[in-house]
A protein has these predicted regions:
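M16 family metallopeptidases and their MPP-like homologs
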Residues: 1-20, 39-47, 98-117, 132, ...
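Short, hydrophobic/aromatic alpha-helical segments in well-folded domains
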Residues: 16-19, 31, 58, 122, ...
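Surface-exposed acidic, glycine-flexible loop patches that form ligand/cofactor-binding
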Residues: 33-36
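An aromatic/glycine/proline-enriched structural segment found at the starts
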Residues: 38, 43-108
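Short amphipathic C-terminal alpha-helix that caps PH/PH-like domains
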Residues: 59-63, 123, 175-183
C-alpha cells in the first residue's frame, strides 16, 4: 500500500472481509478528513487493469485499516513520516508508454514561511528546466516531464514529485538520468541570472493578477451603481429595444 511506502507508520493493519463490509463511504470520508488536511496528502496508484468493484473494495480496505487500527490517530496529530522516502510506479497504458513517478520527502529544518516557499519555487523552476533539457530534448524516449516541490505547513516537511512518460523498456534509464540531473542542480544551486528570470516571471504573473482583480472590482462597482440607480436600468432597456435586428 502507498501508505506503507510513503509513511513509516504502524497503523496499516488489513481488515477481515466482514469488517470491510461494515465500513461505509461516510466512514471513509470521515477517516480521510481526520487524517489529512488536504486531499493531495493521500494518493492511490493503481497498476494494471482492476475491475471497479474490486478497486472500491481495495480503497475501502485501505482506509478501513487506518480507521480500525489498534492505535487510532487523534485528530490533529501529525503522521509519523519517513525522513527520506522514494517510490517509483510504472503504469502501462493502452499504448506502449510508461508513466513514472518518484516521490521524495524531506524533513524541513527551516521555518515554513513565504521566503522558504519562494526559494523552493525558484529552485523548482530551474530544476524543471534542467529536466526538460536533459530528459525530453536530449534523451530520446521521454515524452513529458514535470517537477513539483511542495511544503506541508502542518507537518513542516518538503516533498518533491518527479513524473514523466517514456518508453516502458527505458524507464530505469530515464529515472537514473533524472536523479543525476537533480544532484547536479542541488550542487550548482541557482545563478543570479536564473533568479532574476524567476523574479521577472513572478512579477509578470502578479501584474496580470492585479489587473484581473481590478477589472473585476470595476465590474462589481459598476453593477452596484446601476443597482442603486433604477434610471440606469431603464435607459439600458430602452437602448436594447432600439437595437436593429437582422
Amino acid at each position: 500500500l502507498m501508505y506503507e511506502t510513503r509513511y513509516a507508520d504502524d497503523r496499516t493493519k488489513l481488515l477481515q472481509e466482514n469488517q470491510i463490509a461494515q465500513f461505509t463511504a461516510a466512514d471513509a470520508l470521515a477517516a480521510d478528513r481526520q487524517l489529512f488536511s488536504s486531499p493531495a496528502d493521500i494518493t492511490f496508484v493503481i497498476v494494471g487493469n482492476v475491475a471497479e468493484d474490486k478497486l472500491v473494495a481495495l480503497i475501502t480496505r485501505y482506509l478501513g485499516s487506518i480507521k480500525h487500527s489498534d492505535s487510532p490517530l487523534a485528530a490533529g496529530k501529525p503522521l509519523t513520516r519517513a525522513t527520506d522516502n522514494a517510490s517509483v510506479t510504472v503504469k502501462e497504458q493502452n499504448e506502449p508508454v510508461a508513466q513514472v513517478s518518484q516521490w521524495k520527502r524531506y524533513d524541513s529544518r527551516t521555518p515554513v514561511n513565504l521566503a522558504t516557499r519562494m526559494a523552493l519555487d525558484a529552485f523548482n523552476v530551474a530544476l524543471a528546466k534542467d529536466l526538460r533539457v536533459n530528459i525530453r530534448e536530449q534523451a530520446s524516449g521521454a515524452y513529458s516531464v514535470s517537477s513539483r516541490l511542495s511544503v506541508d505547513p502542518q507537518a513542516k516537511d518538503i516533498s518533491h514529485l518527479l513524473a514523466f512518460t517514456c518508453q516502458p523498456e527505458r524507464h530505469d534509464e530515464q529515472l537514473t538520468l533524472a536523479n543525476e540531473v537533480m544532484v547536479k542542480r542541488l550542487t550548482k544551486g541557482i545563478s543570479e541570472q536564473e533568479l532574476n528570470e524567476y523574479q521577472q516571471n513572478v512579477q509578470r504573473s502578479l501584474d496580470i493578477q492585479q489587473r484581473s482583480v481590478q477589472q473585476l472590482a470595476n465590474t462589481i462597482i459598476n453593477s452596484l451603481i446601476q443597482y442603486d440607480d433604477p434610471a440606469a436600468w431603464t435607459e439600458q432597456e430602452q437602448l436594447l429595444v432600439m437595437l436593429p435586428t437582422y
